[in-house]
């Protein structure tokens, strides 16, 4: 959890926002997936948001669903994802690592055991996409017991009660949704979210990172200008993986070329 705090403190000092890429662990296979993650970090990623392949991803649009299918086709299991996380953490000791996943994968292990495993391999945060704030008590309590930040989604239509709960229960960062619906780069982020950002700050919420539909540097800049601490980009990155599925080296070069200007946009 502390890795987020020190990241945001460092970025504040440098007057930068955070750029956080999302990929699915094991897409398109374990070895290439690890290379992809190294490339994202080398190209300037400030933190990682990683998905564990799940058979019924409700919040995801077709791009990320396809990533999940590719990981399944490669035979990737949740246990292998945990091993991958341990490898990523060994290689990159300071970068915050967040998981974005679904409740079933947590239940399969047992809630406490799942968060214990996260702590052991060096995961900093977990966002359980299909658990609303009002049902989150067993998840967030287990998370905090194991020094893992529970992350909550702040939708664009959040009312005051929800904003207060998110501020009170969330740690690490707040996932600020650009718009309703499923993930996807083709649905551009709708701004402005200034009023939400102002309220979250007022209630001392964890720093907001804006996600959903972030696929260009101008959107990263707009998110930060609206007061967000940074931006998360998933579908646009996963699309690059899809486009170069048979050319692993080209894929890594294209990912680097995408991430560098996205990170540069946090420095304006």
From Swiss-Prot:
What protein name does the entry list? Tryptophan synthase alpha chain
Q: Which CDD domains match?
A: Tryptophan_synthase_alpha
Question: EC class of this enzyme?
Answer: lyase
Q: What is its EC number?
A: 4.2.1.20
Decide whether keyword Lyase is in the record: yes
Per the entry, what this protein does is:
The alpha subunit is responsible for the aldol cleavage of indoleglycerol phosphate to indole and glyceraldehyde 3-phosphate.
Q: In which pathway does it act?
A: Amino-acid biosynthesis; L-tryptophan biosynthesis; L-tryptophan from chorismate: step 5/5
- Show the InterPro entries listed in the entry: Aldolase_TIM (IPR013785), RibuloseP-bd_barrel (IPR011060), Trp_synthase_alpha_AS (IPR018204), Trp_synthase_suA (IPR002028)
The organism is Shigella dysenteriae serotype 1 (strain Sd197)
Pull one GO CC term from this UniProt entry: cytosol
Subunit architecture? Tetramer of two alpha and two beta chains.
**What are the alphabetically sorted keywords of the record?**
Amino-acid biosynthesis, Aromatic amino acid biosynthesis, Lyase, Tryptophan biosynthesis
**Per the record, what are the reactions this protein catalyses?**
(1S,2R)-1-C-(indol-3-yl)glycerol 3-phosphate + L-serine = D-glyceraldehyde 3-phosphate + L-tryptophan + H2O
The family assignment reads: Belongs to the TrpA family.
Q: Which HAMAP family match?
A: Trp_synth_alpha
Q: Which Pfam families match?
A: Trp_syntA (PF00290)
